[in-house]
């Protein structure tokens, strides 16, 4: 019985650490996204990185490939200024992978809400680097 308790306790501690690391990644993801820092934003990901948006699936194999996209001009043309997490709920966790159901809000420069979206982020520990490995969103 003691051995089971010890193993369970060890597993719970690892899961708590995984959740803490995953949430830090999402904090950095949003901060670098809002700062429009493509290089920093790309460092919050693990590769290959997969994004499901609408009916489209996009895979970026490398950080360099991801850094080459220019998402900020398109978003700014919609009135977007910044985004924020409204909720983040862990739905699955292991020592090296955390699935997080999120809701985020897009805002204009006067902090007026534009749109709200649900999404799923899969954050992984790959070779000692915690990053978003995949995300699926109802955002375009």
Q: Would you name each region that the model predicts?
A:
Residues 86-91, 103-106, 118-124:
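Hydrophobic/aromatic beta-strand elements that line small-molecule binding cavities or substrate pockets
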Residues 38-89:
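A solvent-exposed, acidic/Ser-Thr-rich amphipathic alpha-helical stretch
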Residues 82, 96-104:
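A short hydrophobic beta-strand element
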Residues 78, 106-114:
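Short, cysteine-centered beta-strand-loop-beta hairpins and adjacent loop/turn segments enriched
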Residues 114-140:
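Short beta-strand edge/turn micro-motifs at domain boundaries
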Residues 1-43:
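Short, low-complexity N-terminal intrinsically disordered segments enriched in polar/charged residues
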Residues 45, 55-56, 102-104, 121, ...:
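A mature extracytoplasmic/lumenal domain signature
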Residues 55-57, 111, 128:
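Detector for glycine-centered tight turns/loop "hinges" at secondary-structure junctions
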């Amino acid at each position: 019985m003691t051995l089971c308790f010890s193993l369970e306790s060890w597993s719970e501690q690892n899961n708590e650490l995984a959740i803490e690391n995953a949430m830090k990644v999402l904090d950095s993801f949003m901060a670098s996204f809002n700062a429009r820092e493509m290089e920093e934003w790309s460092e919050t990901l693990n590769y290959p990185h997969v994004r499901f948006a609408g009916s489209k699936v996009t895979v970026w194999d490398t950080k360099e490939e991801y850094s080459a996209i220019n998402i900020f001009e398109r978003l700014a043309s919609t009135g977007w200024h910044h985004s924020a997490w409204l909720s983040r709920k862990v739905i699955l966790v292991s020592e090296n992978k955390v699935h997080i159901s999120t809701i985020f809000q897009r805002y204009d420069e006067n902090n007026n809400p534009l749109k709200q979206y649900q999404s799923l982020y899969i954050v992984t520990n790959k070779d000692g680097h915690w990053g978003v490995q995949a995300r699926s969103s109802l955002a375009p």
